[in-house]
Amino acid sequence: MSDFDSNLDLAGTGASPAEAAELQRMLAVEQQKAQFTAQVHNFMDVCWDKCIDRPGNKLDSRTESCLVSCVDRFIDTTLSITNRFAQIVQKGAH
């Protein structure tokens, strides 16, 4: 969840409905960027702790393979959970 209110009240600001809608859209885009950045940091934290034994000048093949697999699993799991949640929400709407 974000600290931003996605239903920002712009009454009294002099913003036209079109300007308010554009501001809402821009806010949603920025929230998505922030969520993506947070997810990348989460991948980095989890996979770094799992795969990096000792930092060096470059990654060896085992470490690189571990990082790729870790991120792939993380993404697959996130997508699976997201898809399942969407199915539950969709079933609830019917």
UniProtKB/Swiss-Prot annotation:
It is found in: Mitochondrion inner membrane. It is a peripheral membrane protein. Gene3D superfamilies: Mitochondrial import inner membrane translocase subunit tim13 like domains (1.10.287.810). The keyword Disulfide bond applies. A motif (Twin CX3C motif) lies at residues 47-70. GO terms for cellular component: mitochondrial inner membrane. Disulfide bonds join 47-70, 51-66. One of its GO terms (molecular function) is metal ion binding. One of its GO terms (biological process) is protein transport. InterPro entries: Tim10-like, Tim10-like_dom_sf. Keywords: Chaperone, Disulfide bond, Membrane, Metal-binding, Mitochondrion, Mitochondrion inner membrane, Protein transport, Translocation, Transport, Zinc. Belongs to the small Tim family. Heterohexamer; composed of 3 copies of TIMM8A and 3 copies of TIMM13, named soluble 70 kDa complex. Associates with the TIM22 complex, whose core is composed of TIMM22. Mitochondrial intermembrane chaperone that participates in the import and insertion of some multi-pass transmembrane proteins into the mitochondrial inner membrane. Also required for the transfer of beta-barrel precursors from the TOM complex to the sorting and assembly machinery (SAM complex) of the outer membrane. Acts as a chaperone-like protein that protects the hydrophobic precursors from aggregation and guide them through the mitochondrial intermembrane space. This is Mitochondrial import inner membrane translocase subunit Tim8 A. It comes from Xenopus laevis (African clawed frog). The lineage of its organism: Eukaryota, Metazoa, Chordata, Craniata, Vertebrata.
